[in-house]
Design a protein with these regions (language model features):
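Generic detector of short, locally flexible boundary/turn motifs and exposed helical patches
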Residues: 2-3, 40-45, 65-67, 144-147
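Acidic/histidine-rich helix-loop elements
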Residues: 40-52, 154
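A broad, structure-centric signal for solvent-exposed, well-ordered loop/edge residues
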Residues: 29, 43-45, 134
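The AdoMet/dcAdoMet-binding core of the Class I SAM-like
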Residues: 53-156
Length: 156
């Protein structure tokens, strides 16, 4: 007979918001490429030694759109949703003078990005609260705002 205790958890980490799971997606077994699954959907893919590549069409489109809108290398950006933090990680390499703020409601997702997706938060500002509330309360203004928060197929 099966028991709940005998069943291994499918979550790498269970947070207050998500079942967070990591999946190795390396095609050659040599390069470390990993996906982050939140509940049932891949929310990002990152490579240890290649922060410049966006591995999903979604991330590539958001990055490309933002890069066409930046007024200069010292732009300010507000990202709603962190996931693997692939875009901020790339921007840290390209635009070290940019002021990037990320609203990620789940601190466990941010910790997972740091521990397993090679994200260094020291250059950015991270806000662990609902982005709508933060934007309503802050006096800060941003050159770019990217909405990349979703749960499975719904935007909050």
């Amino acid at each position: 007979a099966w028991s709940v205790q005998a069943m291994p958890s499918v979550c790498t980490k269970e947070s207050d918001y998500f079942c967070i799971r990591f999946v190795d997606v390396s095609s050659d077994g040599q390069t470390t490429v990993r996906g982050m699954v939140l509940d049932h959907l891949v929310h990002g893919i990152g490579a240890q030694d290649d922060p410049m590549t966006m591995y999903t069409d979604h991330a590539a489109a958001l990055d490309h759109l933002a890069m066409n809108l930046v007024p200069n290398a010292a732009f300010s950006a507000f990202l709603i949703g962190g996931g693997t933090y692939s875009i901020p990680r790339k921007w840290q390499m390209l635009f070290p003078e940019a002021q990037v703020t990320i609203a990620e409601i789940d601190p466990s997702v941010t910790q997972a990005a740091q521990d397993s997706f090679w994200y260094d938060p020291t250059q950015d500002t991270i806000v662990h609260q609902d982005a709508r509330r933060f934007l309503n309360e802050t006096q800060d203004r941003y050159d770019i705002v990217i909405v990349d928060a979703f749960t499975d197929i719904a935007v909050p």
